[in-house]
Every structure is written in structure tokens, then in C-alpha cells.
A protein has these predicted regions:
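Polysaccharide-binding and catalytic clefts of secreted carbohydrate-active enzymes
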Residues: 1-5, 139-142
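Substrate-binding surface in catalytic domains of secreted glycosidases
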Residues: 3-117
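Short, acidic/polar
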Residues: 33-40, 147-161
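Generic serine detector
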Residues: 35, 86, 127-128, 134, ...
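Glycan-binding loop/region signatures in secreted carbohydrate-active enzymes
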Residues: 91-155
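Acidic/aromatic/glycine-rich contiguous surface patches that form carbohydrate-binding/processing clefts
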Residues: 155-174
């Protein structure tokens, strides 16, 4: 991620790819992680750049949402220098086990069904729009955070307000 020589090689590859794609009448879409050092690189015009706006929390972290409004603002500020940008959002979430850092991915429907089975009502987090709840099953106490349709709509609205224009969204789902 931080190997700038490797990034420079990638950008040379991308320039060649864009020329070949143009000759063939094809579009190019490049997916970038939030950790991409865009401030140190000069990405060429011609591709659609899709920025991953998720996995703020996940396996190996404490429980939390896939994204929150502050994270979305950071991603926007960092990547707005790119031409032709769109944003990737992810539904679903994670179930964190007892220790708080081991997490398993889950779909939004699975999380909702788990809450119903456990007899708990998920709460909506104000800083992210995501839903969360904890439950006990036997001797284990798990915590679930997930994004539903309302969460995705809030994240899309947040990005639209930041850009001041219509944003293009790619939806990642399990």
C-alpha cells in the first residue's frame, strides 16, 4: 500500500490499459482502498475511480460500523482530487464474538433475523447511521453492527452533501 515504486508501476500499467481500452471501445474502472496514497500519485484521466468507503471496523478491530460520517468525509477529502470518482458502499456488517476482535461477516437480513431470534431491538448509531445490538446465547456475548437500506441512504446523502452534486454509488454486498 505504501510502496510508491509499485504504485508508479501500476500507474504506467493503467495508462497502457486506458489506451488499449479506448481502442477497443471499453471503459476502465479502478477500485481503490481508502489507504491509497492519492496525495503522492498522479492518476490519469480516463478511468472511473471507485473508492471503497467501508471496513472502518471489521475482523481484528473492536466492534463498530463499516463506515461512519466522519470516515466518509475523510475519504471524500482525500480522494476528491481524482477525476471521475464514485464511491463503493457495503451493506451488511459483522458479528463480533466474546473477545471483541474476532468478527464474522453477516448480511443485513441475517443480522435482522439474529436480533429477532435473540429478542432484541437494534439501535441506530447517530455517528454512522448503522444499526447495532448485543445479545447473549449460552455463554457467549456477541455484538452485531450492520448497514441496512436506511444506512446506505444516509451514507449516500452524506457523500452527496460533501460533493455538492449527485454521487455515483457502487454497492458491495455479501
Amino acid at each position: 500500500r505504501k510502496d510508491l515504486d509499485l504504485w508508479q508501476a501500476f500507474l504506467k500499467f493503467e495508462e497502457k490499459l486506458l489506451l488499449l481500452a479506448e481502442d477497443a471501445g471499453l471503459k476502465v474502472r479502478i477500485v481503490l482502498e481508502p489507504s491509497t496514497p492519492v496525495e503522492q500519485l498522479d492518476f490519469p484521466a480516463g478511468a472511473e475511480y471507485v473508492v471503497m468507503c467501508y471496513n472502518l471496523y471489521g475482523n481484528g478491530t473492536m466492534p463498530g460500523p463499516k463506515a461512519d460520517f466522519a470516515f466518509l468525509q475523510q475519504v471524500y477529502e482525500k480522494f476528491r482530487v481524482l477525476p471521475n470518482i464514485s464511491y463503493a458502499l457495503a451493506n451488511g456488517g459483522y458479528i463480533w464474538e466474546n473477545d471483541g476482535t474476532t468478527a464474522t461477516q453477516c448480511r443485513a437480513a441475517e443480522a435482522k433475523a439474529l436480533a429477532e431470534k435473540a429478542g432484541v431491538t437494534p439501535e441506530r448509531d447517530e455517528s454512522s447511521g448503522a444499526l447495532y445490538f448485543s445479545y447473549t446465547e449460552g455463554r457467549k456475548n456477541d455484538t452485531v453492527w450492520y448497514a441496512d437500506e436506511q444506512t446506505l441512504a444516509q451514507w449516500t446523502r452524506c457523500l452527496g452533501e460533501l460533493t455538492g452534486e449527485k454521487v455515483f454509488i457502487s454497492l458491495w454486498r455479501l
